Amino acid sequence: MINSPILIVGGGAAGMAAALSARKRLSELLPGGEAGNCITVLERESEPGGVLRQCIHHGFGLTRFSSDLTGMEYMQRFAGPFAASGISFLPDTSALEAYPDKTLLAVGPKTGRCRIHFEHLILASGCYERSFQSLTAAGTRPSGIYTAGEAQYLINRCHAGIGEEAVILGSGDMGQILARRMILEGKKVLAVIEKNSVCGGLLKNRRDCLEKYRIPVILSSTIASVHGEGRLAGVTVQNIRTKEEKYISCDTLISAVGLIPERRVLKGLGQDGRLPDWISLCGNCHHVHKIVDSVTLQAEETGKAAAEKLAFSVLSGLSKA
């Protein structure tokens, strides 16, 4: 059994910000103590940073740091202090389930299968992508179909080519950023398909990604069917209102159809719709944020509140002794 008064699940932007904020507040409230020893961060990847590690485009930190940073640069603003903080960090460790007795089941190469006891749990586990398979498009499921996150990881982290001619489903920020990335990689983006009557995402991204590179956007439409054996050959695009269809020949389909907060570790809790007061959510697992700066702000407040609750408990115990 591992004991950690404050346990944080997720070492991305939210997890690091919450951990650093909690450590700072504990140092203020419990001077002379080892604040870092009170906090443990679990991360399923080998390094902290989360999705920021695959974001090489600019647009981060405009609010938090008044600087136009890449995702990697934004991450480094926290990764350095986090590494030097003395906060316990367990990489390559997956959180499986939290229990009512304030324990969490985890598994990793350093810990094996173990239980971690905590006083306060901060869930900073981000989101997972809604897959193309969750949609009702007919046809085959050949290779060449990716979620936006998968495509971004393969291009930016693995330096892999995923195709030559792409159609992107979803005009939110992620879809727009991937469209630009494909163009910069020397590929063709034949169309961005959007089910709504207006383009999604931030105006800045629309201007910098779609309008600047003259990428066609087809509104009020969806992908009705997929074609190809072995490799994607094309898609049929259908207008939602008129049902008019158009075939587009392509070898790559990138699906950017939404994010779902990752809360499955809490599946055994909150059966009545309310979570115990010893659990906090922050970042994209709380709700999907438009920018990482607001993720950081919320996470810092969450970490501070958890530290104050822990310090109050410790000081109350000392006064009763």
Please place each PLM-identified region on the residue numbering:
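Residues forming the flavin
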Residues: M1-A321
